[in-house]
Amino acid sequence: MKQTILVTGGTGFIGSHTTVELQQAGYNVVIVDDLSNSKIEVLDGIEKITGIRPAFEQVDLRDKAATEAVFQKYPDIEGIIHFAASKAVGESVQKPLLYYRNNIVSLINLLELMPKYQVKGIIFSSSCTVYGQPKPENLPVTEEAPHQKATSPYGNTKEINEQIIADYIHSGAAIKSIVLRYFNPIGAHPSAEIGELPNGVPNNLIPYVTQTAMGIRKELTIFGNDYDTPDGTCIRDYIYVVDLAKAHVAAMARVLDKETEPIEYFNIGTGTVSYTHLRAHATRSNLVC
């Protein structure tokens, strides 16, 4: 019998690619998304790639009753991959309470419902932001690296949510978790049926570059040119989104394994440095060619 996985934020960039990989690995998928930063048409792309249209429920996870109704409708859910969150760093500085409400309340609702509906494990989408700005001599960052004070409310919600999960499990809750701290996902599925298609202004480099190259945006502005790097711009560790999606599938298989630890942490990246200006130039050159 196929295992059923709930993917929150499943019509988003990483969520949609993870849904594809889950279905191709033999899982049933139920997507929950409020469509605040994604499009329902993403389901069409997933179906074209896999031949399977995942179950979909448009739900705001802050609404506990609506969230519980999902578990009642799909009682065979065994695991959760939790992507759903507000994620624009700049906006989080302008609207901190919105970010604390969206990102923290939704997780608490899921955690409270998991034991009631015998959901075994949750994969939490965390971020390298918990490490702050490590010094060059401390790169690449390991899971044992000390956490630093978050530079934005968005980053702070990731740190807080990690602690909430740990505290809940350590209190004796009958669930398990794997926290994935990943770096900078880029790219799109090779079929080109799904990719990074945010509503409004993109928050990440690659969709901004592609929209500028297509004439949707007038220009690309890169902030910061005095970093101690070869091109003066900040460094990033870019990871291909399909590889990241496969990491989530592996994590789900692991968290459902009875022999693993109650909570584990893994960084997901390449360990390879990229410079923002050079990456933008390379992407644009490939588009033009």
Q: Model regions: which residues?
A:
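Residue-level signal for the nucleotide or nucleotide-sugar donor/cofactor binding architecture
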Residues: 62, 94, 102, 152, ...
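N-terminal Rossmann/SDR dinucleotide-binding element
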Residues: 2-79, 201
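Conserved small/polar residues in nucleotide/adenosyl-binding loops
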Residues: 276-283
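Alpha-helical substrate-binding/gating segment
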Residues: 187-188, 210-228, 236-265
